[in-house]
Amino acid sequence: YKRQGVRLLGELGYTYDSWHYHFQNAAYTELAKSASNTTVVLDHFGSPCGVGSFEGKMQEVMEGWKLDITQMAECENVVVKVGGLAMPVNGFNWHKQEVPPSSDEVAQAHRDYYLHTIDAFGPSRCMFESNFPVDKLSMSYSVYWNAMKKIASEFSDDEQHQLFYGTAAWVYRV
């Protein structure tokens, strides 16, 4: 019944936006495959966890997550909101620091997640997002967006247009 509902969203011209954790990526990919007529929006990268049983295992989590993202990108109906990595659940622990991170620190720590995802999906299927006010626990809004600009500087003007505007305008018809 869940898959029927997601397929119905596509028939009605709606998107299916979902946030979940990295260990749910395979099920999400299967859902996207079963509803190929629906634009499926992955929020927050399919959040790689860095707390609880995943604490201290960021490299191991990232290796599996990269494989999942690469496989998910084969589903042409999936687009990605790239952002939301500053949540405490991601394990960067900036919310525990006395001094918040700089935009350079954020860009450096998150760069591999962004570049891998944008490389797998292409800029036309990725859109920058903010996750405020949740990310405010870790950094200011201006620090976050300055970090995104630094990451985006590695892309052409046309690709930056897609990441900052074009993909979102296309997906949400605005």
Question: What are these model-predicted stretches?
Answer:
Residues K2-M127, S138:
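Catalytic pocket-lining loop regions of alpha/beta-barrel enzymes
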